[in-house]
């Protein structure tokens, strides 16, 4: 049995509250996934990930990257360890991408054919080949609860003709991905529970070593809607993938440099077509206000490296206070001058009222600031540490700074999704 998706409360704008049942647990939707590229959410230990957020529930699901784990330490090693959950001692659901986006981002280091993609490792220049079948083989070895069909992410901008051809390749690869998955889905490492128990398996409730937990369960496979920035191609791609009957559907190829209003339009057009009884996943987005907006539109799943990447560069998200909102609105359209005057940057679209601010902890104005990052945030960082201390850690290049910054930003994102879930329940009760 693959995933089971329950849809509960829904709003007039299309947002819905639900629950995604997966082999390693139940995830409340809509939700945001922290990105654990190389089987680690950078700078944040797993036990901390399980507890961050206002309610202490932590991240219910995280993402790992197939391309990076294939190159190092290798999918066969991870298979021998019992899968990526056991390898990294994570007892909650996981998703792996197909590796396609990373391969195609190599540009000069890859060659695309109908069979797949030949590419050179960014680590040592060695030559490799990813086909849909090989991507599935690697993802089955990793053993995440959800895996993605192999796809081509077209460059931006691209002509309609180039985008159509790329989309056709994605559809052909999706069919091949599904065919291989259906034939080999019982080969997932945790299906047999043949790996001996180790310290990394003895998690708090011991459930990773419980053979009955996974009996009759398999991974789930999502198809990825492409079509660039062309609504007609997006529709065609969604309809073609629906015919293939995937467990869920992702909207890919967005947040690659296009204006925010185009991103929103492509998501809205695609959501109109995708089936309501399957989870809907927008890949690689976005800023705090954007993930809240997309969840209210009916997106169930999102991921992005932004909260942790920004944190490592000293950029922290916080709630805008009432007076600041007006000041930020006044600065909209003034571009850099407005940002310099305020020392911060709002994170919404150009026609929206900002509710989240991205602050630069490196600024000298925080050197003696004894306030927390966000007085309204209940994360452990905001409960204990001052802006002055966090600035000191960053300027001194202390590793703890990256950890604390990342914990706060992730908690900020997870709390946004918790609030949206509450809004959807409340809207359904009115």
Where are these regions (language model features)?
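Non-catalytic, usually N-terminal nucleic-acid engagement modules in DNA/RNA processing proteins
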Residues: 1-187, 364
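C-terminal extensions of enzymes
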Residues: 1-21, 27-34, 43, 151-157, ...
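Conserved, mostly hydrophobic/aromatic
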Residues: 25, 62, 97, 139, ...
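Active-site pocket-lining/capping segments in soluble small-molecule metabolic enzymes
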Residues: 90, 95, 100-107, 113-124, ...
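Glycine-rich phosphate/ribose-binding loops and adjacent secondary-structure elements
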Residues: 184, 216-222, 226-330, 343-373
């Amino acid at each position: 049995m693959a995933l089971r998706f329950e849809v509960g409360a829904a709003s007039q704008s299309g947002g819905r509250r639900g629950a995604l049942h997966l082999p390693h647990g139940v995830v409340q939707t809509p939700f945001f996934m922290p990105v654990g590229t190389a089987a680690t959410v950078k700078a944040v230990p797993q036990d901390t990930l399980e507890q961050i957020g206002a309610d202490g529930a932590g991240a219910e699901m995280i993402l790992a990257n197939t391309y990076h784990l294939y190159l190092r330490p290798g999918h066969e090693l991870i298979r021998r360890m019992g899968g990526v959950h056991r390898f990294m001692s994570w007892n909650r659901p996981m998703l792996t991408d197909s590796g396609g986006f990373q391969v195609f981002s190599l540009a000069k280091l890859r060659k695309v054919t109908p069979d797949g993609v030949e590419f050179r490792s960014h680590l040592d220049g060695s030559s490799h080949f990813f086909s849909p079948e090989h991507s599935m083989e690697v993802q089955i070895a990793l053993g995440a609860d959800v895996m993605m069909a192999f796809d081509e992410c077209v460059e931006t901008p691209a002509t309609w003709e180039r985008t159509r051809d790329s989309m056709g390749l994605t559809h052909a690869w999706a069919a091949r991905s599904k065919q291989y998955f259906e034939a080999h889905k019982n080969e997932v490492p945790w299906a047999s529970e043949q790996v001996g128990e180790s310290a990394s398996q003895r998690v708090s409730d011991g459930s990773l070593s419980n053979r009955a937990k996974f009996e009759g369960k398999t991974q789930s496979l999502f198809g990825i809607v492409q079509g660039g920035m062309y609504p007609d191609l997006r529709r065609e791609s969604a309809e073609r993938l629906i015919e293939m009957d995937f467990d869920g559907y992702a909207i890919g190829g967005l947040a690659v440099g296009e204006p925010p209003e185009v991103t929103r339009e492509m998501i809205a057009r695609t959501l109109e077509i995708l089936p309501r009884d399957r989870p809907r996943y927008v890949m690689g987005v976005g800023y705090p206000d954007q993930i809240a907006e997309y969840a209210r539109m009916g997106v169930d799943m999102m991921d992005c490296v932004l909260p942790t990447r920004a944190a490592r560069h000293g950029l922290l998200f916080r709630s805008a206070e009432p007076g600041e909102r007006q000041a930020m609105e006044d600065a909209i359209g003034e571009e850099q001058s407005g940002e310099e005057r305020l020392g911060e940057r709002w994170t919404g679209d150009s026609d929206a009222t900002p509710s989240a601010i991205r602050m630069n902890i490196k600024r000298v104005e925080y050197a003696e600031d004894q306030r927390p990052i966000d007085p309204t945030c209940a994360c452990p960082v905001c409960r204990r540490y001052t802006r002055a201390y966090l600035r000191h850690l960053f300027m001194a290049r202390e590793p703890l700074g990256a950890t604390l910054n990342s914990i706060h930003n992730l908690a900020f994102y997870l709390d946004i999704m918790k609030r949206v879930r509450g809004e959807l329940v409340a809207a359904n009760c009115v």
